[in-house]
């Protein structure tokens, strides 16, 4: 499995509608250098709740191990239409001292402050991370499956790109 320290991570995808569907494009550390989740960090490039089709989330998880961890991020609401009606491009630019999230080429969030119980800034985001793409069904973030959620559900991915300087 490939892993990276810094870069631009991009995916073009069409997201599935339905209560309880939870597609995500995210990153975990290759090693738990600072301890168990989330002390070693997690980078959520895009998370989606199938029952909120016009909104995606980008979040950093860090600090101490769960349940004393910190998470910081915000949702982005599409100005017109929703994320289930066609392909959209989700991207993250990760530098030593900043994270920037993009949707369809528009910057929607920036974070420059985080901390770690295990080391000085920029820990825990000073180590290599690998990519994860998944479609969860149910769970704490996605919520329970709705009686009208249609299966099979598809998280359609056109491409994933990783760019580095």
Which sequence ranges carry the predicted segments?
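GH16 jelly-roll
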Residues: 1-165
């Amino acid at each position: 499995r490939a892993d990276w320290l810094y870069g631009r991570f991009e995916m073009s995808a069409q997201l599935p509608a339905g209560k309880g569907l939870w597609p995500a494009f995210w990153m975990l550390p290759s090693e738990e250098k600072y301890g168990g989740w989330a002390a070693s960090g997690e980078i959520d490039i895009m998370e989606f709740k199938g029952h909120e089709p016009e909104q995606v989330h980008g979040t950093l998880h860090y600090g101490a191990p769960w349940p004393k961890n910190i998470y910081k991020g915000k949702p982005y609401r599409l100005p017109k239409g929703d994320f289930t009606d066609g392909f959209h491009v989700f991207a993250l630019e990760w530098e030593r001292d900043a994270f920037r999230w993009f949707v369809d080429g528009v910057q929607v969030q920036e974070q420059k402050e985080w901390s770690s119980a295990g080391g000085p800034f920029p820990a825990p985001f000073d180590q290599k991370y690998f990519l994860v793409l998944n479609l969860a069904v149910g769970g704490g973030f996605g919520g329970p499956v709705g009686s009208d959620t249609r299966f099979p559900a598809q998280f359609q991915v056109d491409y994933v790109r990783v760019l580095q300087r």
